[in-house]
Amino acid sequence: MEVLEAVKASRSVSKFKSIPIGDDKIQALANAMRMAPSAENLQPWKLIVVSDEDLKRKLSGAVMNGRGLPNAPIVLVACAKLDEATATVGGYMNSYPVDVGMAISYLNLAAVNQGLGTNWVFSFNEEKVREALRIPEGAAHVVALTPLGVPEAPDPPEGRKHTGELLSFNGYE
């Protein structure tokens, strides 16, 4: 599948078939993720693959509406390894939100290419996620949760803004 085809085919998925996801597919997604660009090529991320039903229920309890987590075969938890990200110095932004976001984007496109669906989840209680997955304090920041599986049916496509609404040249318009 061409990259632009994967971008156009990408949808948020909240209902999944109960088909197990093989380790080979997880490894392929991790491989795509590691190819994502990052500041100074530090790759400051850690991906936690959750298949345990009890852990998935705990994670669902940490999410604002639990959307898509309980019925997904896998929940991916994307973390930023704080000691490996560029530091906030001199008023510059720490790179990890962008670095991990890029890595998740690569993973999502690779998932679409494999016929899998995902759905970024950002509304969660980080402390509950950290506790459920035994993430040591100060070791990592949980950036997003992503249910993963074979889509039962993709959510309907949402309208997109025209490029004219998104672009301006040589200044903010």
Q: For the regions a protein language model found, what residue spans apply to each?
A:
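C-terminal helix-cap and adjacent tail motif
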Residues: 3-22, 144-173
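Short Asp/Glu-rich motifs
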Residues: 25, 52, 130-132, 149
